[in-house]
Amino acid sequence: MRAAQLLGVKTVLYAVTPGPFEKVKERELALSVFSSFSLVVIREKLSKKNLEKWGFPTEHVIWAPCPSFLFEANKSYKSEWTEKIENTHKNNRKAIGITFGGFNMPIGPYDMWPRENSQYTVFLEIAKYIINHMNSDIIIFSHTNGFELPPNFKLKPGRDYMILKQYYDLLVQKNEKYKQHVTLVDEPLLPCDLKSLIGKMDMLITGRVHASVAATSQCIPTVYIEYDRNVIYSDKMYGFSSQIGMDEYVCIPGDRESLKNTILSCYKNIEQIKMQLQHRIPQIQMQAEKIFEVIKEDVQGSVDL
């Protein structure tokens, strides 16, 4: 990127959560590259305050919602997983999705493997509470999947799947009866199919920010689990949730009571949250589309910040 800037090429940084820059050894280079962008489009308004705190210029920084709010689900998607949700509803129970990864675990690094069973204690207690006290079934799925490169292209489970598979195994080992109330999606899905699956749920609990977008963009009430600050610093969960009025549903990983109370609050207010999202999401999507015109004008040299 710096090479392009030195050659006089106009560069735009788009849909970004910059930083943190507090401990970056190459801070001088980062500052030089950042200052040379003609336009920086941040995904969360909170990022601008962070940039100012870190001493980075913000005159060329503007906010627009993440373009992932515009991603469309495969409305025709059907599978054994959607059938599970349909059966849950026939039994007059709600279907609650759960996904998280290494950034939400109490011990780092995020890619630690294997993991001790004790690291799942809080998540296990939350699952049991949902099943026993919230009249709900659980759909566990990975929102980060990989693929093999062409010519042998095929989807494969990402790193989160190992963590979630261990979570599922520990849960059903504790009580065989939980098998009828807990489903593990044990295959990687195309993004459009996964979004469709999420859209059929009644509620989502997520430690992955783009899973929250997949849910809220379809007006599915969502609980956000922050990244554990002992593993990595990030304000993304607060940033994404606050722009749609959902910041009260952000909770700290590892805090059993915070998780339980936040999940219960979301559950009790499902219909109210849906109405709130039905009002807010179209506005967010309109803003996400408008930024493309701003970028075009910047590239053509006529943007007025």
Regions found by a protein language model. Name each.
Residues M1-L305:
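Active-site anion-handling motifs in enzyme catalytic cores
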